[in-house]
Structure formats: structure tokens, C-alpha cells
């Protein structure tokens, strides 16, 4: 069969650009004309031309922001979407590159941003989906699936523990439940917490938010209230859960801070609620808990927006700056010493520290010779 662009006397070529699945677009006739005037256009050369033109068109359609921060945000969003849409084998390979520690009992990874741990409505791919594939990549085709030992929120990055055996996973889960695992999170906050160090001990419960955007949020359920300047104990809500968070400001600027958080308890969204509603310092990029009455992009001061190089209309693209920085596991299984695991910050988190003028603390202090310290790659 002759190539479609070869001209035949008395035959008029018709454009099919308006039809779905078209072979030619209006711009493709130019190279067909020039090509046929010099030498025949065979099927291979035609395919190469069409492929090059398609790539060129796709490059033109991608709008690259001129602002560096907007470019980083766009890259983050695109990378997150790709992680949820890739083939499970590709995601498992990405997680294998993020392994922080591996032994006969455990595999510890540096969880990426925007990746759910469990499936649910609207979730195309999650970490639990690819654990069987990851296990086979690490231990061969006969390997049993890895098991989750705990969970992190979709937007939270950092240390995440997996176990080879179900029994070991239950043992680690019991350590978390009985508060024998020491956890440290880092967060960038909007405004600076006062005092600079302390303990937030306020119960938390889930509550329905009335209004045009009816939804549910976790909120504070205080055991005390102020009455004429005195603290008066109130009846505890049956739905409230004890929630305790230790915090310390590591670095601060005029309108933001780097805060280290140690959750004593493990209630849903505990750190976000205690910072936002307990200390009035929401986490940067927390578009859910920055305002109680509605779900809307976080409102930032003009000074903060200027430092980030963003306009308020682009604030919705700012990711949640909450990172599971460090985990200390007691001796367990084949290990005779505790294991200290430290994860480096995501690129977007480190860049925000730089832009906001927040200093990185010195290298975390080790816990002595009995602790085995592992630093994330």
C-alpha cells in the first residue's frame, strides 16, 4: 500500500483532523509536502515524523511557570499524580529505592508525599497494594507479602515500618499501642508557637461541621474551661480521646517556625489539630485544619507569601509540611539493641525552610552506643 502522503494526479487529499483518533493534524501536512517533494516517505519515516510532532505538541501544551517555587509545586503535584497512576511494578521499584533499613524481620522505607497507605474511594494505587510485589523484588518470587506495622497519612512523609512476618507486624503494632516507640515529627508552622516548648494535653474528638460545606473534622474537646479567670473542670465527652503532644521550636522567623513534635498518643490528625486549634499555629499547607468552618486553601500573610514567591490564589498547591523525621524501635526479634531511624527531609520541605529563613538544626544527637543509628539516603 502506498504511503498516505504520496500525491497522485487527480486525487485530492482530505484532512481528517476533525475526526477522533485522527492520523493527521493540520500541522502535519507541511512535512508531508516537503518530504514527498524530495524522496518517498516510507512507513518508518512517517511514524518517526508523527512521533516527533506529537512530542513537540505535548511540550508546547505544558505551561512551565516562570516562578521557581511555582515550578517546584507543579513538579510535586505531577510527581504525586504519577505515583498513583503508574503500574504497581513501577511504584514497588520506587519504594525499593527508598529503603532505609532492612533485616530479617523488618523493612523500613522513607514514605513519599501524597501516597496513601490504604485504599479507599478515589484511590487508584496505594502502598498496601504493592507490598507483595516489593517483597518479591527483595526476596525473590517465592517471598510472602510484607505487612504494614503502622500508618502515616497520605500527605505525611518519612519513616514507615514494614514486617516480613505477620507475627512480627503484630509485635511492632503492640509496641506502638503501648507507647514504647519514640516518634519525632518535624513540621513547618504558620506563626511561632508560644511558649517555645511545652506539652499540649487536650482530648480530641471527631465532629460534624455544619454549613454550606458539611463535613467532619477532628477537633479539641477540652476537659477544662475558663470561668471568671479560673480553670473549671467540665464533663468529658464520651467521644473524646486522650491526646498528648510534646513540642519544641527548633528554629523560628517572623511568621513561621520549624517545630519538633513528639506524639505521646496516636489519635487521628492529632498533630495537626493540636498545632492549629491548640497553639493557633497550623502546619504550612494544611488546608483542612487552618479554618474550622470550611474546607478552603490556607490563608497566608503577605510576608509569608512573598518569601514563598506565591500569590494567595496559588496557596492551594502548597503541600502539607509534616515529616516523620525519626523513629526509635526497642530491641525486638533478632535485634539485641534499639534501632534509631532518621529520614532526610523531602526536597520541597528543605526548600521551604530556606525560603522562610528557618535554620536546619545540627545533626540529631545519637542515643549512645546501645542505639544503632540509620540515616535515610
From Swiss-Prot:
Q: Per the UniProt entry, what are the Gene Ontology biological process annotations, in alphabetical order?
A: mitochondrial tRNA pseudouridine synthesis; mRNA processing; mRNA pseudouridine synthesis; positive regulation of mitochondrial translation; RNA splicing; rRNA pseudouridine synthesis
TM region(s), chain numbering = none
Catalytic activity, reaction form: uridine in 5S rRNA = pseudouridine in 5S rRNA; a uridine in tRNA = a pseudouridine in tRNA; a uridine in mRNA = a pseudouridine in mRNA
Q: The organism sits in which domain of life?
A: Eukaryota
Entry's CDD domains? PseudoU_synth_RluA_like (cd02869)
Keyword ATP-binding tagged? no
**Catalytic activity, EC:** 5.4.99.-
Q: Matching Pfam families, A to Z?
A: PseudoU_synth_2
- Main enzyme class: isomerase
Gene Ontology MF, one? tRNA binding
Under the heading InterPro entries, the entry gives:
PsdUridine_synth_cat_dom_sf, PsdUridine_synth_RluA-like_CS, PsdUridine_synth_RsuA/RluA, RluA_PseudoU_synthase
Q: Which residues are the active-site ones?
A: 153
Ligase found in the keyword field: no
In which compartments does the protein localize?
Mitochondrion matrix; Nucleus; Cytoplasm
User: Matching SUPFAM superfamilies, A to Z?
Assistant: Pseudouridine synthase
Q: Which UniProt keywords apply?
A: Cytoplasm, Isomerase, Mitochondrion, mRNA processing, mRNA splicing, Nucleus, rRNA processing, Transit peptide, tRNA processing
Its biological function? Catalyzes uridine to pseudouridine isomerization (pseudouridylation) of different mitochondrial RNA substrates. Acts on position 1397 in 16S mitochondrial ribosomal RNA (16S mt-rRNA). This modification is required for the assembly of 16S mt-rRNA into a functional mitochondrial ribosome. As a component of a functional protein-RNA module, consisting of RCC1L, NGRN, RPUSD3, RPUSD4, TRUB2, FASTKD2 and 16S mt-rRNA, controls 16S mt-rRNA abundance and is required for intra-mitochondrial translation. Acts on position 39 in mitochondrial tRNA(Phe).
Q: How does it assemble?
A: Interacts with 16S mt-rRNA, mt-tRNA(Phe) and mt-tRNA(Met). Forms a regulatory protein-RNA complex, consisting of RCC1L, NGRN, RPUSD3, RPUSD4, TRUB2, FASTKD2 and 16S mt-rRNA.
What family name appears in the similarity comment? Belongs to the pseudouridine synthase RluA family.
- Name of the protein: Pseudouridylate synthase RPUSD4, mitochondrial
Provide the species name.
Answer: Mus musculus
